[in-house]
Amino acid sequence: MAKLEEKLTEMLEPGVEALGFELVGIEFVRAGKHSILRVFIDHENGITVDDCADVSHQVSAILDVEDPISTEYNLEVSSPGMDRPLFKEKHYIESVGEVVQVRLSMPMDDRRNFKGKVLACENGMVSIEVDGQQFQLAVANIEKGNVVPTFD
């Protein structure tokens, strides 16, 4: 996770949790005047549009006071969705048995992209099976990770 996302997570997590939601993670996509701050939230009973609106108001208020982003951006608050982003070790633990797509910050075995089944996750390492071969990936080296939805 980049420094800005880490700072934003620390800043926003208490406010999101105060509303009864889990802050799954944050993405800041820089795109000139059209930068986007994505805030992913979850709840054991699911997420509604009203939940997203409530969290958006809370997050906006915090960001207005703290002003951590110097450029213009649009704020998006949503549930993680079927292709759930994976930000923390906890998310990989919850994804054991599922297929995930990950991109590493630093290449391993001359590759950065892995798509496979999560076998285990412990002590900061994710074990992923890709085409019958196992890889041990450090969570700290994962730049981006998502669950790959399967339709049976």
From Swiss-Prot:
GO biological process terms, semicolon-separated: ribosomal small subunit assembly; translation
Q: List the disulfide bonds.
A: none
- Record keywords: Cytoplasm, Ribosome biogenesis
Which CDD domains does the UniProt entry name for this protein? Answer: YlxS_C
Gene Ontology cellular-component annotations: cytosol
Where in or outside the cell it occurs: the entry states: Cytoplasm
InterPro entries documented for this protein? Ribosome_maturation_RimP, RimP_C, RimP_C_sf, RimP_N, RimP_N_sf
**N-terminal signal peptide:** none
Where does the protein principally reside?
A: cytoplasm
Check the record and name the Gene3D superfamilies matching this protein: Ribosome maturation factor RimP, C-terminal domain, RimP-like superfamily, N-terminal
Q: Does the keyword Cytoplasm apply?
A: yes
**Record's Pfam families?**
DUF150_C (PF17384), RimP_N (PF02576)
UniProt lists the family membership as follows:
Belongs to the RimP family.
As for what it does, the entry says: Required for maturation of 30S ribosomal subunits.
- Per its UniProt record, what NCBIfam families does this chain match? PRK00092.1-1
Name of the protein this chain belongs to: Ribosome maturation factor RimP
Give the organism the record lists: Alteromonas mediterranea (strain DSM 17117 / CIP 110805 / LMG 28347 / Deep ecotype)
Query: Encoded by which gene?
Result: rimP
